């Protein structure tokens, strides 16, 4: 893959934006830790269960600062609401809970467990809220803690927490954050310098729900060309209508200069599309690059192996083996069709913000998966004191 050079004006904006992110407390660092300062957040999402280990910063009860030390996930596709995915999710939740206790010596009362808005939305659409209640009960039984609180968060709450957990304070009021999850997409921006007043951006579509809708349309023809055709049809239907409405209703175009995208697909695209920025947790996104990458996923996926992408890296100071390893991780989480679904959704959203009169700046946040759950833990800890 030939690395696409970043234009000078984009590089300057990226440098400023990226440096603020790097100085932000919510980044991964190697640090001496005290067990008393450690907390854990377990997030049950559409695709799997995720664990974030958080170290609260100095004066955290006042500032809310934190450091995300460890991230671990287990994929189990709870969103299918089948007996097998149900059992796998309970097992995943329990194993991550026990991992936090055994490996990090975190007390049970410092472990917070939350059901994400993507699960909630899909369960409501399929009339499967009883599955969520059963999941909570089974998890409590598994860890022998019948009184544990396992709240179900809504899209507004998750979007607000994502912004607080991902976007540094210096960019908080001119950045529109969009988190593309497995089950839905949510985000927004804070109005009038008030972190309690989020202008919500919400879609009932995420990487997994787009892929599922595409699979349902394929009938007997399971070929890749048919998948691509049906994917385009899915995106041209309700998702496109929701995107256009959500963008126009948000008023974000005139109110924000920076548009940051987080979620698993943001990490995947950033890792595969910009391998020379492998050491950066935030990378700039060029619309034309994204469009070409989206086409390549369907037409020439064989050229996107970890080995071939890493070999294309020109900078000799970078570790190509590590780059290939990270791309391999991406492709274990997202197969070709999942990448096509998620990237196409990302492309359709970016297209709506790609203006002709006023140039906007787009960014991909790689470690955004710890964002909202980290902010939830931080907020919960603050409320304890």
What are these regions (language model features)?
Residues 25, 56, 127-130, 190-193, ...:
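Short, glycine/charged-enriched secondary-structure capping and boundary segments
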Residues 40-41, 71, 112-116, 151-153, ...:
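Extended hydrophobic secondary-structure segments that form protein cores and membrane-embedded regions
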Residues 30-63, 166-199, 203, 264:
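Gly/Thr-rich phosphate-binding beta-strand-loop-beta motif of the actin/hexokinase/Hsp70
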Residues 107-111, 174, 258:
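Residues at the starts of beta-strands that form the adenosine-phosphate
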Residues 81-94, 121-131, 140-173, 199, ...:
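Helical "lid/coupling" subdomains associated with nucleotide-phosphate turnover
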Residues 47-84, 193-228:
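Short glycine-rich, Thr/Ser-proximal phosphate-binding strand/loop in the N-terminal lobe
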Residues 1-28:
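Bacterial Sec-dependent N-terminal signal peptides
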Residues 26-38, 49-50, 56-117, 133, ...:
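N-terminal glycine/serine-rich phosphate-binding loop of ATP-dependent small-molecule kinases
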């Amino acid at each position: 893959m030939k690395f696409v050079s970043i234009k000078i004006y984009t590089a300057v904006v990226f440098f400023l934006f990226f440096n603020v992110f790097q100085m932000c407390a919510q980044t991964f660092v190697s640090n001496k830790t005290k067990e008393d300062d450690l907390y854990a957040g377990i997030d049950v999402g559409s695709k799997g269960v995720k664990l974030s280990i958080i170290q609260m910063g100095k004066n955290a009860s006042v500032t809310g600062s934190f450091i995300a030390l460890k991230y671990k996930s287990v994929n189990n596709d709870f969103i299918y609401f089948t007996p097998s995915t149900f059992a796998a999710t309970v097992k995943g939740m329990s194993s991550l809970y026990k991992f936090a206790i055994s490996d990090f010596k975190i007390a049970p009362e410092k472990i917070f467990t939350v059901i994400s808005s993507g699960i909630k939305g899909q369960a409501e659409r399929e009339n499967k809220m009883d599955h969520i209640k059963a999941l909570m009960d089974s998890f409590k039984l598994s860890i022998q803690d019948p009184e544990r609180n396992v709240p179900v968060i809504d899209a507004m709450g998750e979007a607000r927490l994502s912004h607080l957990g991902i976007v540094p304070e210096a960019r908080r009021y001119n950045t529109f954050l969009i988190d593309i999850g497995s089950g839905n997409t949510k985000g927004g921006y804070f109005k009038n310098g008030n972190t309690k007043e989020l202008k919500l951006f919400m879609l009932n579509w995420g990487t997994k729900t787009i892929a599922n809708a595409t699979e349902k349309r394929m009938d007997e023809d399971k070929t890749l060309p048919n998948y691509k055709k049906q994917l385009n049809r899915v995106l041209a239907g309700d998702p496109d209508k929701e995107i256009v409405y959500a963008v126009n209703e948000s008023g974000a175009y005139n109110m924000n200069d920076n548009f940051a995208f987080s979620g698993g697909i943001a990490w995947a695209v950033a890792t595969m599309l910009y391998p020379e920025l492998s050491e950066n947790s935030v990378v700039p996104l060029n619309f034309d690059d994204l469009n070409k990458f989206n086409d390549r996923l369907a037409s020439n996926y064989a050229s996107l192996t970890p080995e071939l992408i890493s070999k294309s890296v020109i900078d000799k100071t970078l570790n190509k083996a590590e780059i290939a390893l990270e791309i391999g991780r991406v492709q274990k989480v997202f197969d070709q069709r999942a990448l096509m679904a998620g990237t196409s959704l990302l492309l359709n959203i970016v297209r709506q913000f790609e203006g002709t009169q006023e140039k906007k700046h787009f960014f991909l946040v790689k470690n955004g998966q710890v964002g909202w759950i980290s902010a939830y833990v931080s907020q919960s800890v603050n409320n304890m004191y």
